[in-house]
Amino acid sequence: MRILCTNDDGIHAPGLKTVEQIARAISDDVWVVAPELDQSGVSHSLSLNDPLRLREVGPRHFAVRGTPTDCVIMGSRFILKDKAPDLVLSGVNRGRNVAEDVVYSGTIAGALEGTILGLPSFALSQEFTIETRNAPLWETARTHAPDIIRKVMAAGVPKNTVVNINFPACTPDKVKGVVVTRQGKRNPGFLRIDERHDGRGNPYYWIGFERIKVEDMPAEGTDLAALAANFVSVTPLKLDRTDETFSAALANTLA
């Protein structure tokens, strides 16, 4: 099985080394094509106004000056054009990709692009806490991911579906199990703007995120709830985002 690995944290990110280890636990034919620089939060963007630069940084390891989407396209349609990958693994992201993260995440986008190209694709993310922020517990993803991926691949991944896997912020032995979840939803106030000032007194701004409060505990059955209870969350995400229920109602409204 030929596996293409990518991420959004960049070619030198520790999570990329982790996803490569996960891939090598499944196959010996592993290729890494990842962004030259950190591309967190770029979602599914394509580089259409700038040329892509490709640099070989080691055997079967390539850095692309572009987005995760660019990397999957370069990997599958150029670097591996003679024999396409059988599987795309995107991650392991530093931090979870759940709820609304799904629409912002470059990690998810890398897997989505693989799906668009007709390849079974998984997005992998490792949650961290305030205490583990600077040293996420990569061993949790490394320990549990290979078995999950093997089982899902054996069952078969439907076309136009991405498998989004999030690992809780606990050691491997503390993981309570694996659950299939639905995409959760946060309180709309989870985004914030931080205003700061440079040395000349000019303002600049950072987009930030509020942590979930106790009173905002997530709904049961969601990716958020699974991680909070130390379960691995496995969420199938469809490429087709059509709201079928509203479509039917809208058709009657506009008839």
From Swiss-Prot:
One of its GO terms (molecular function) is exopolyphosphatase activity. Keywords: Cytoplasm, Hydrolase, Metal-binding, Nucleotide-binding. A divalent metal cation binds at residues 8-9, 40, 93. GO terms for cellular component: cytoplasm. Binds 1 divalent metal cation per subunit. It is found in: Cytoplasm. It catalyses: a ribonucleoside 5'-phosphate + H2O = a ribonucleoside + phosphate. Its EC number is 3.1.3.5. SUPFAM superfamilies: SurE-like. The keyword Nucleotide-binding applies. Its main location: cytoplasm. It is an enzyme of class 3 (hydrolase). It holds the Pfam family SurE. Its cofactor is a divalent metal cation. Belongs to the SurE nucleotidase family. Nucleotidase that shows phosphatase activity on nucleoside 5'-monophosphates. This is 5'-nucleotidase SurE. It comes from Rhodopseudomonas palustris (strain TIE-1). The lineage of its organism: Bacteria, Pseudomonadati, Pseudomonadota, Alphaproteobacteria, Hyphomicrobiales. The gene is surE.
